[in-house]
């Protein structure tokens, strides 16, 4: 959520920036009308409160003098009723302002390139050289099915399309990737591993920006029958990423600045409805309703957040480097960034069967956008004032997509898969997966 004071002091500039950089049309007249109502009602409530307090004191003095206080009591009661009405109206207007603020995207950092879509993203670097194959390349689906380790038909039978069953050595390789990522981030990069709920309430989803704007992308819980009005309602959402519960750990908290940065990592299943992606990536593991991811989150002091973004992105890159997977690092343009991000790097891994780079990690600095929604603050020792923290998040990495990259980049002519050296300790020393 952007700072409401920006709308009060620089409304036209903010509106122009949102239109230019975010293709978001802010209704300036609506903002002005709500702000005028808020100021008027604020003055009214403060005036009524002051007058009511003054007359309440007069009642005590008049009573001490033995005067008739019935008229004063009636006036105080009337003012009390007027005050309650004014407070109710003020609360309503403030609620409308908050609902409006919750729909406004973050303002990009100055260095973010202007652009409409991913074609105008800026490539920062490439690492590694794509392997040259001397045999016909198979995609991960064919490789996995031939090894009897990837089973999409059973996933459809059990649930629906975009679900999968993994078996045997492929399932173990998938698990090995997640364990390798967790170990590297927790043992070498200084992150604390956290096990979080997969179901979260609406306050949590509002805190990180999934609600109210992206509810259709979430899976929500509800009674299976939906017929009995006496059934207990369970208004929870399945997490689309561990960023949601991890970041919300500091919601409504004031943390000691000496404890910053807070660096958290979690390995979780993630659930996404993939609304609007019909027909895209229908084959394989690239776009699933359920997938696993190792997520990195940092909570930092405001002046440290850009430095932290470089660090976090580099830590995600380290996974790809140790796996010897070619990738490129891309700075997203204004038109391709996420709703709450101020600056985002994407890491895209080379997939031989597609002959292209595909996103495997997105690392973002949210500035104080999420912190303001969550009321997540920090305070220095000896300082009475608090300030909003900055939050960052990134995939370190998406496990399923990393599996895709390993299968395709490490395939052999006979259909076997060479296991990357760093994963062999997690695979009982096995060097290859064979049929």
From Swiss-Prot:
It catalyses: tRNA(Ser) + L-serine + ATP = L-seryl-tRNA(Ser) + AMP + diphosphate + H(+); tRNA(Sec) + L-serine + ATP = L-seryl-tRNA(Sec) + AMP + diphosphate + H(+). One of its GO terms (molecular function) is ATP binding. Keywords: Aminoacyl-tRNA synthetase, ATP-binding, Cytoplasm, Ligase, Nucleotide-binding, Protein biosynthesis. ATP binds at residues 272-274, 359-362. It comes from the Bacteria. SUPFAM superfamilies: Class II aaRS and biotin synthetases, tRNA-binding arm. Its main location: cytoplasm. PROSITE patterns: AA_TRNA_LIGASE_II (PS50862). Disulfide bonds: none annotated. InterPro entries: aa-tRNA-synt_IIb (IPR002314), aa-tRNA-synth_II (IPR006195), aa-tRNA-synth_II/BPL/LPL (IPR045864), Ser-tRNA-ligase_type_1 (IPR002317), Ser-tRNA-synth_1_N (IPR015866), SerRS_1_N_sf (IPR042103), SerRS_core (IPR033729), tRNA-bd_arm (IPR010978). Pathway: Aminoacyl-tRNA biosynthesis; selenocysteinyl-tRNA(Sec) biosynthesis; L-seryl-tRNA(Sec) from L-serine and tRNA(Sec): step 1/1. It is found in: Cytoplasm. HAMAP family: Ser_tRNA_synth_type1. NCBIfam families: serS. Catalyzes the attachment of serine to tRNA(Ser). Is also able to aminoacylate tRNA(Sec) with serine, to form the misacylated tRNA L-seryl-tRNA(Sec), which will be further converted into selenocysteinyl-tRNA(Sec). Consists of two distinct domains, a catalytic core and a N-terminal extension that is involved in tRNA binding. This is Serine--tRNA ligase. The lineage of its organism: Bacteria, Pseudomonadati, Pseudomonadota, Gammaproteobacteria, Pasteurellales.
